[in-house]
Amino acid sequence: MCLFSPTRLLPLLFVLVGLNASGAGPVFNVLDYGAHHDGSASSTEAMRSAIQAAKAAGGGTVFVPAGNYVTGPIELVSDLVLQIDAGATLRFPAAKLPFTKGRQQGIECLTPVPLMGGHDLHNVTITGRGVLTTDNAEWLKIMPRTKATKDDPGTANGPNWERLLQDLEVKTPAPDEDYQKAAPELRPSFIRFMDSTNVLIEGIHFVGSPMWTIHLLYTDNAVVQNVIIETYPGVHTDGIAVDSSRNVRITSCYIDTGDDGIVIKSGKDADGRRVNRPTENVSIVNCTVHHAHGAVALGSEISGGIHNLVADNITCRGTAIGVRIKSRRGRGGSVEDVRFNNWTMEDVGEAINVTTDYQMEGEVKASEEPVSERTPVFRNIAISGMIIKRAKLAIDIKGLPEMPISGLRISDVIVSAKSGMRGSFTDALELRNVQVNADNGPAFLIQDSKELELDGVATRKPLADAPVVRLERCPGAIVRNNRAFAGTGTFLSVPAGELKNVVLEGNVLDGAKKPVEEAELILNSDTRNQERVIP
């Protein structure tokens, strides 16, 4: 039975009004307001004065000509075009900043003001071929760090933040002194728009970032295009974070970062469900991601839901993961009607990772619990048209026993990897025209899944000592139109007594020494994660 329906993936129709980079109204040159284009002194006040002049005029363009400028945080206003000309570099030194309302780790709280952006704005454009730069390492120096090693300067947030976070998660009023203690442990986003509409960011080159580079929070109708983000190896310097926002288009961007390239979020646990603002109608097209934890990552903060997303024509190289969709017990929320098409990946850790059983290093694994608002739901996800070279792990799918991942379809994928596909706790998983060429283990190991359909799966690298397909506890499985190539030892292996649960149709298995066998278990759910390489 196929629960997946392409018609359920709603078209992404964006009415992007008011996003005109050419601007309207007068032009305000920051040099006329005392900016220092040689970097000899701070231009913070000049930037502020030019922006306020544009505001007083009812809108306009603030122009930053070529030169080197040193500035503190820049608060934008509505009906504004900030044009940063080619040859202009704005450098933001690390500093302790005042607090404003925001969201940190999916929890509403006070956060440092962003280096650029604003709250409750409309019709704002940041454009040009200029450079915005800061030094992630300098921001880390002003923070107390824990668990530091020669390879990792330590966790992003220290014990004071963790204590504050615990208060916020249960909505206990946090004393001002707790915020003051946590302040040195927090960093701002480079650009953040909150509760804003009609936002355009285009052409800008980011070099370094304190934390997230572009953060769209509670924002409707936003475009990020032709942007270059180079923050690798900065700690937690995600490229573009779309957080409880709607109608967002990200196109033709290059991102080289030490964290996720493009990350989609909607709040964490009880606070995220209280806010209850999904991220929806997101289009990500023609982007390249280098390094990064995940090229395009959804979660794990999905408590408000993520709906109607397309990521098409993406190239990633050297990322820990390519496609990453993650959540865990306690989050709640749903990820549904999302599509990943036409990707190329090289030298990645895991090519495709979809899990509702995510846990960070050092966390205690959550125990199984009855289905409730705390249970995350993944359904109607399509992944297709991918060529993947030199992955460590091809595909990793893991749902929850109490809430399997439903309606996941993977099609037209060719992947070479050290280890093959592993999947568990799914409902109506479909693999169509999927080729996994793995160095070891079964090419396809699927456990505890019902209504599974394998149509046209294969390996061009058969192993004499491992089956191509291993199914364990998979009632209602259909295995059809598959081919065993010469040199295959066993094509399909199932535990003793389970072959009756599998329907075989139209397979060409004469290349296998054993087309089908019933054998003792070779792997179990506890060993399936031994090849995991992700942070």
Where do the PLM segments sit?
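Bacterial N-terminal signal peptides that target proteins for export
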Residues: M1-P11
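Hydrophobic h-region of N-terminal signal peptides that target proteins for export
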Residues: F14-S22
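Extracellular/periplasmic carbohydrate-active domains that bind, remodel
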Residues: G23-P535
